Amino acid sequence: MDSVTPTLPRNILSIQSWVSYGHVGNAAAIFPLQRLGFEVWGVHTVQFSNHTGYGAWTGPVFEPGVIAELLDGIEARGVLPQCDGVLSGYVGSGGTVAAVVGAVGRVRQAHPQALYCCDPVMGDVGRGVFVHPDLPALIAAQAIPAADIVTPNQFELELLTGQKVETLADALAAAHALRERLNPAGPRIVLLTSLVRADAPASSIETLAVTGEGSWLCRTPLLPLDPPRNGTGDAIAALFYGQFLRTGSAEQALTLSMSALYALLDLTHRLGTREIQLVAAQGEFERPRHLFAAERVE
């Protein structure tokens, strides 16, 4: 009987918020990535009781120095060369942006092929900017040029580029403009999430992946989730990033991640819960039962 040689999982450093109750930030990203087969080294930028969508919460925002201190400890274990990528989301304060970019630099120094995926959490349609007013400019100036993959929602793409997105042509133009500002040594992928445009079929929502090899659009039915569920953007950033690291294909990653996200949100809707049902939907993350195929648009 042939023996199978065991292999170690790949490793991702994820720097985001954390909540004790519910699923946003690292609490929405770590588990899906683990289900995709990754070891995740979680570094938390805040430790809140629950997400801020409830209007009240408790807990601290961590000082930027905490991130560097935790990286010191990880580096002391001699494992940074084994880190395959960095994922960042909600950062909490301006100094934390520089700390995240510093962490990316340290990982790349140890492992030059490591990919940085930046979810530029700043705001959303209907809510406007919900972070400190200084953060959008700092993210644009520091995190975006370091990123290999960036996953803005429609509001954040407009904020980062100054371009209004109302049609598919608008979305492609803005995504290409942002893509030109990403790390020139990387794949330069823009994943535009929660795209709602005037020239799309009714009752649908789309995600657009723009790369140097082409652009793909994935459309799913728009579920009547009111209010919109917090953590959705954190989950899709993690799912897309993980699937891209697994497949090396933006098209495949878009199909698989959006199909998994739809299954997650559909189950959340059917159960009628305020929090996204990550644990209940976990079987959909690696191999979604129903695929929404990405369509090439350029």
From Swiss-Prot:
GO molecular function per UniProt: ATP binding; magnesium ion binding; pyridoxal kinase activity
Annotated metabolic or biological route of this protein: Cofactor metabolism; pyridoxal 5'-phosphate salvage; pyridoxal 5'-phosphate from pyridoxal: step 1/1
- List the Pfam families: Phos_pyr_kin
Its required cofactor(s), as named, are: Mg(2+)
Any single GO CC term annotated in Swiss-Prot or TrEMBL for this entry? cytosol
Residues annotated as binding ATP are D119, E156
**Domain of life where this protein originates:** Bacteria
- Give the EC number(s) under which this enzyme is classified: 2.7.1.35
- Write out the residues that bind substrate: S17, D234
UniProt keyword terms in alphabetical order: ATP-binding, Kinase, Magnesium, Nucleotide-binding, Transferase
Membrane-crossing segments per the record: none
Q: Which family does it belong to?
A: Belongs to the pyridoxine kinase family. PdxY subfamily.
Q: How does it assemble?
A: Homodimer.
What's its job? Pyridoxal kinase involved in the salvage pathway of pyridoxal 5'-phosphate (PLP). Catalyzes the phosphorylation of pyridoxal to PLP.
Q: What name appears for this protein in its UniProt entry?
A: Pyridoxal kinase PdxY
